[in-house]
Amino acid sequence: MVRILTERVIEGNDKYIEAAGLSTDSKPTENIVTGSVFLEVNTGKGFLFNETAGTWVEQ
């Protein structure tokens, strides 16, 4: 289960989030802005969201 640790509304429905979950969890993609952060707790991998591509990019 994905846990949203931080959520800030940027404009309208768009929001910046910092979230954590398992690598098998579906990462959120709707109304998320570039630079949002996701940590896979079971792998230790970190991801940043790319709003233009609509994908999470491993860092």
Predicted features along the sequence, with ranges:
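Tryptophan-rich substrate-binding surfaces of secreted polymer-degrading and adhesive proteins
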Residues: E51-Q59
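Extracellular/surface-exposed low-complexity repeats and stalk/linker segments enriched in Gly/Pro
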Residues: M1-K45, T55
